Swiss-Prot record:
Region (Disordered): 1-30
Bias (Polar residues) ranges: 1-29
Residues where Phosphoserine is found: S23
NCBIfam families listed in its UniProt record: SP
Glycosylation sites: N225, N416
PANTHER family per record: GALACTOSE TRANSPORTER-RELATED (PTHR48022:SF75), PLASTIDIC GLUCOSE TRANSPORTER 4 (PTHR48022)
Name of the protein in its database record: Low-affinity glucose transporter HXT3
TM annotation in the entry: 58-78, 114-134, 141-161, 172-192, 199-219, 234-254, 338-354, 361-378, 386-406, 429-449, 467-487, 489-509
Topology in membrane: Multi-pass membrane protein
Single GO BP term: carbohydrate transport
Gene3D superfamilies the record matches: MFS general substrate transporter like domains
Gene that encodes the chain: HXT3
Segments in the Extracellular topological domain: 79-113, 162-171, 220-233, 355-360, 407-428, 488
Length: 567
């Protein structure tokens, strides 16, 4: 084959959509690319499988619905943005901290780590236990229940007077709710969104996280000059508004057609597909989509109810898929994003910024607008290319950030005044890092796991994968104060090494799923397609007569030629 590997040519992956199949088919068949050439069979298949509603407003309805569901990410982002400021606010320190001999208040490293990071443990447990509600009562009702649990946790936190462990318990309970949201929101979006926009719409979940972080920073900045509990109780009180908005939004969102088919509600599933695609319920396109979903559900039923063990022993390739989901979610945390977002205020103090709350807002702005860019890149360049290039970009940023912090920040030794130029350089490259993270790994980790698993094990697999994310979030959140106290900005080299590993892992283990239905992704795994050749894979119903499926399953070249050479 003469196709170029994903690393070299992001354009190849970006063209792998159902609307542009001739280009992909020609790569596999060793033929020149001719966009105007299709065989009659493929053209006929496309006519049925393609949404006939291609006007300017074709996806407005489903986009609005998915943004409402994605608002669950805002709830998590708000917590991340506010807690980073709480641990530096005077009233919070007075109520929940300890007293120095000079009369000032502080939070010990252990207490800081627990207050900040225990939320992640709650999220991990909630993701595993509460995600099952989506299978039992539907994705919408499951989301409403976990939001109510989140509200209970917020009430406990606001009611805390001076007992840090009461606040601690409240964060665990609110974490249970957010953990359920983190599984059910991307799941519902991926099952409702048309395949042409699934990557973009699932990425809206991450966009809402960044918006929550940014507005959380802004709220902390607005309340920091108060001398009483307004500093932290007002940001917490606003959580009620976000939760009620999400519950209200659920009344307008259609239920997952895949869940409805599984529950035997075929007419409701047809209506859901009709609503999100803006096509009449009796249109052949809706019937075709419904038949594909029904076939998938029937196949799952024939195999019986899924056990947890099936995540590692099931077919096709469930062990590989489960481990890939766990690794991608783990590596998203090991990018080091929460080093900046949880402890951004502390980091800015360390580099000599005069108003660390104000500078945190800069992070929030960069994060939000960079994530807006990801809504374009995720479906334009594909999942693999974004993850690969994102890892390279973050490695470069960490090299500069850590090196300047270690060698130039304190020219006269730590504690003897910092270099303003070095501090500014570190802030700039921290912003570059956030751009690389927010446009690639931040949203695409959720996109990948929402597309990877078949329906019968989806809630279990996604909950395990996101639990790995929360577990690493806890470890990073808890141990960061100790690690930075011991090795300071050498910490950046740790995350740099993780990103080097992430690059190689993605190249060899993560396939391209852009432009495929959830059922087609399952077929691709069943065929054993090599991840670095997966961008050239074509669904069975759309293959030409000369399609060489076997060529995508074998590669005898040395690894360096797989990665950098032409096939």
């Amino acid at each position: 084959m003469n196709s170029t590997p994903d690393l070299i040519s992001p354009q190849k992956s970006s063209e792998n959509s159902n609307a542009d199949l001739p280009s992909n088919s020609s790569q596999v068949m060793n033929m020149p690319e001719e966009k105007g050439v299709q065989d009659d069979f493929q053209a006929e298949a496309d006519q049925v499988l393609t949404n006939p509603n291609t006007g300017k407003g074709a996806y407005v309805t489903v986009s609005i619905c998915c943004v409402m569901v994605a608002f669950g990410g805002f709830v998590f982002g708000w917590d991340t943005g506010t807690i980073s400021g709480f641990v530096a606010q005077t009233d919070f320190l007075r109520r929940f901290g300890m007293k120095h001999k000079d009369g000032s208040y502080y939070l010990s490293k252990v207490r800081t780590g627990l207050i900040v990071s225990i939320f992640n443990i709650g999220c991990a447990i909630g993701g595993i236990i509460l995600a099952k509600l989506g299978d039992m009562y539907g994705r919408k009702m499951g989301l409403i229940v976990v939001v109510v649990i989140y509200i209970i946790g917020i009430i406990i936190q606001i009611a805390s007077i001076n007992k840090w462990y009461q606040y601690f318990i409240g964060r665990i309970i609110s974490g249970l709710g957010v953990g359920g949201i983190a599984v059910l929101s991307p799941m519902l979006i991926s099952e409702v969104a048309p395949k042409e926009m699934r990557g973009t719409l699932v990425s809206c979940y991450q966009l809402m996280i960044t918006l929550g972080i940014f507005l959380g920073y802004c709220t902390n900045f607005g309340t920091k000059n108060y001398s009483n509990s307004v500093q932290w109780r007002v940001p917490l009180g606003l959580c009620f508004a976000w939760a009620l908005f999400m519950i209200g939004g659920m009344t307008f969102v259609p239920e997952s057609p895949r869940y409805l088919v599984e529950a035997g509600q075929i007419d409701e599933a047809r209506a859901s597909l009709s609503k999100v695609n803006k096509v009449a319920p009796d249109h052949p396109f809706i019937q075709q989509e419904l038949e594909v979903i029904e076939a998938s559900v029937e196949e799952a039923r024939a195999a019986g109810s899924a056990s947890w063990g099936e995540l590692f022993t099931g077919k096709p390739a469930m062990f590989k898929r489960t481990m890939m989901g766990i690794m991608i979610q783990s590596l998203q945390q090991l990018t080091g994003d929460n080093y900046f977002f949880y402890y951004g205020t502390t980091v800015f103090n360390a580099v000599g910024m005069s108003d660390s709350f104000e500078t945190s807002i800069v992070f929030g702005v960069v994060n939000f607008f960079s994530t807006c860019c990801s809504l374009y890149t995720v479906d334009r360049f594909g999942r693999r290319n974004c993850l690969l290039y994102g890892a390279i970009g973050m490695v470069c940023c960490y090299v500069v950030y850590a090196s300047v912090g270690v060698t130039r920040l304190w020219p006269n030794g730590e504690g003897n005044g910092s270099s303003k130029g070095a501090g500014n350089c570190m802030i700039v490259f921290a912003c570059f890092y956030i751009f690389c993270f927010a446009t690639t790994w931040a949203p695409i980790a959720y996109v990948v796991i929402s597309e990877t698993f078949p329906l019968r094990v989806k809630s279990k697999a996604m909950s395990i994968a996101t639990a790995a994310n929360w577990l690493w979030g806890f470890l990073i959140g808890f141990f960061t104060p100790f690690i930075t106290g011991a090795i300071n900005f050498y910490y950046g080299y740790v995350f740099m090494g993780c990103m080097v590993f992430a690059y190689f892992y993605v190249f060899f283990f993560v396939p391209e799923t852009k432009g495929l239905t959830l059922e087609e992704v399952n077929d691709m795994y069943a065929e054993g397609v090599l991840p670095w050749k997966s961008a050239s894979w074509v669904p069975t119903s759309q293959r030409g007569a000369n399609y060489d499926a076997d060529a995508l399953m074998h590669d005898d070249q040395p690894f360096y030629k797989k990665m950098f050479g032409k096939k």
